[in-house]
Amino acid sequence: LGYIWGFNPLSTDMVFKVTGRECAGAAIACTLGRAPTVANMRLVNDRMNVFAGQFNYPVGDLMNIPINTTMRGEVAFLPNKPYNISMFPGAYGLRASANPKYPDGVVEKNTLRYALGFDRTTLIPFLHPDDPWRAFSLSFQLFQNIIFDHEDGIHPFSSASKINRVSSLLTFRIGTGYLGDTILPDVFLGYDPEGYWSANPAISYVPPGNEKIKISLVGAFYGGHNKFKALGLFAE
């Protein structure tokens, strides 16, 4: 368990804040209220309170079934976390525009984040004919972000894609080694239930007797309809 008071290291948690407003027109037009108002904004990273904890627990049997899996987890509670908020749909045919309820474009909400992971090694002999005792490493993770007292229109500073009350991300990874662990194949899969997926197959070469050198070839494949969510941003 722990407590952090400081700046959030995640750039995606930054928000745009209004620092001032001014009239964008001639003095007479501003006086008559016939000139548009321009809002000056700044991207800020405020100090935050974070209550966090983690655990790591090996599980040998589940209901008398040997699973030999390590279960691990992390949890963080962020009170009064700032979010940008807009009105959807926006005025004048825009996808989003300023929310009259929040003229500064920022709202604070208590937020819970957690991750739950399962790791294990398993033998797949037919994929290792040269060394049937060389194991495969398997890892599955679930990430969730929950916004309490959620309001419609909350979105990240970087896009006009709304953040739901509960956001989820699933990942799976499998890897092993061949020829004395000089050839290391690896596959990473990610799935966002809101509309995106990614697949990253990779193969690495580690010269014998020199573990400090590693040469990797990584593929990147993306799909789905929502390119503004977490996985979709990498496709752009």
What are these regions (language model features)?
Residues 1, 12, 69-73, 116, ...:
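Transmembrane beta-strands of outer-membrane beta-barrel proteins
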Residues 5-9, 77-81, 122, 142-148, ...:
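Transmembrane beta-strands of outer-membrane beta-barrel pores
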Residues 59-69, 123-136, 177-185, 208-214:
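Short loop/turn motifs that connect adjacent beta-strands in outer-membrane beta-barrel proteins
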Residues 1-100:
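Long, internal scaffold/assembly segments composed of regular secondary structure
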Residues 16-24, 87-94, 154-162, 204, ...:
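Flexible, surface-exposed loop regions and adjacent strand-edge segments
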Residues 1, 53-57, 73, 116-120, ...:
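Residues on the lipid-exposed face of transmembrane beta-strands in outer-membrane beta-barrel proteins
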Residues 47-51, 108-114, 164-170, 195-199, ...:
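Residues that define the transmembrane beta-barrel architecture of outer-membrane proteins
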Residues 37-42, 97-107, 156-161, 187-189, ...:
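Extracellular loop and loop/strand-boundary signature of outer-membrane beta-barrel proteins
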